[in-house]
Regions:
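A short glycine-rich, His/Asp/Glu-containing loop-to-beta-strand
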Residues: 10-64, 117-122, 126-127
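Tight coil/turn sites that cap or link beta-strands
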Residues: 56-61, 95-97, 104-105
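Short beta-strand His + acidic residue motifs that chelate non-heme Fe in jelly-roll/DSBH
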Residues: 63-65, 83-84, 92, 101, ...
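A short beta-strand-loop-beta hairpin characteristic of the jelly-roll/cupin
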Residues: 67, 73-94
Length: 133
């Protein structure tokens, strides 16, 4: 499984990339009803220290270059957000998608839909580098 990420290079410029999240095919509910006993691909658990729910109000269209305070996974619940990195590349992220955002360097620009938007932000102290035990 892949997750979009925004990262900074040593010169501080931000860029897009992907994180490959390893998954394993496992039985979902082996002790449940036969209809619930299907196989699905699952990753290991990752340590999360905080979770918050965010509502971006209607009219809050653009957030200029910024970084979150820590390793953050943003999951968009509705609408579509547009990100721009300092190298000028622009990507759109639709509802249901997640982005691992940069924590240093020049940051990124976020552009939100005129009607507002909702997201969940999960602080991952170790990012997606190391699953928890």
């Amino acid at each position: 499984m892949k997750c979009l990420r925004i990262f900074a290079t040593p010169d501080g410029e931000s860029h897009f990339g992907e994180v490959d999240i390893p998954t394993t095919l496992t039985r979902s509910f082996p002790n449940g009803a036969p209809a619930a006993n299907y196989e699905s691909s699952r990753s290991a658990f990752y340590e999360a220290s905080r979770v918050r729910f965010v509502h971006i109000p209607a009219g809050a269209r653009e957030a200029d270059f910024h970084n979150p305070p820590g390793r953050l996974l943003a999951i968009w619940l509705d609408g579509e957000v547009e990100f721009e990195t300092s190298d000028g590349e622009v990507r759109r992220v639709s509802a249901g998608k997640a982005v691992l955002v940069d924590t240093h360097g020049k940051g990124h620009i976020s552009r939100h839909p005129p009607e507002g938007q909702n997201s969940i932000q999960v602080v991952l102290p170790h990012g997606l580098d190391a699953p928890s035990a």
